[in-house]
Amino acid sequence: MVVTDIQAGICGFRTTVRARSDDMQNVTLEIESTCEKISALAAKLGPIDAYQEIGAGFDGVVLTAARQVLKGCCAGCAVPSGIFKTVQVAGGVALPAPISVTIERKD
């Protein structure tokens, strides 16, 4: 199992993604979030073929569902990228490593 903890930023919402794959290709997700929009996104995601997902890139299942659910300021949410990376690791097409985005205002 792959577990990813995502802290989305200034909104303060937290998301935990648990991903399993019995065959290193087809990935089942369990997503818990304090954000109702991410919970709605999670409800749209069934099992995902990691090979198809990585090949489709921005047109894959995760990011397509994110575009449908996350509108306005939520369109910049980091959680969908975290879900996508978790699918990659669970499917064996990427290695686990921390990712981060740091935003600072330097006037």
Language model features: what each stretch is:
Residues M1-V27:
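Short, charged/polar N-terminal "headpieces" of proteins
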Residues D22-F84, A94-L95:
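Active-site- and interface-proximal helix/loop "cap" or "latch" segments in soluble metabolic
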Residues P80-D107:
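C-terminal charged interaction modules
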